[in-house]
């Protein structure tokens, strides 16, 4: 697939060069990417979940896939009418950094998961490393967000409220 080729030929080396290696818990040297419509309540506009990494998948336990896997949304991430797989490339880099970060922090260093705000910042940096460009798409949201204007803290990661402010 086009998505897999982009990951293998471009994203993988760029992200691992800056952030380190992924784990290999199943000893197959493969990373799985599951693309599906993440049921996130998207109503046609606003925020949606573009993808995610679930650290439990790296463990041999119940409700785990027991492998290196991350998940990419197909709706609306690929577009609503004309599907464009290239719209997911930055999300691939973003979610891959989460996997690497967990491997480095927890498995290699024996620590705990990195604070969400810092881990998300590093995943945003992975997007920039991959594209070679500054991420400017969120500047308008930052400038006009009412929660940021009211003092929304960089250190407080609000998963239930104004999620887009976290990424701005």
What is each stretch, according to the model?
Residues 147-168:
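Active-site-proximal alpha-helical
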Residues 1-115, 122, 126, 132-136, ...:
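Juxtacatalytic substrate-recognition/specificity segment
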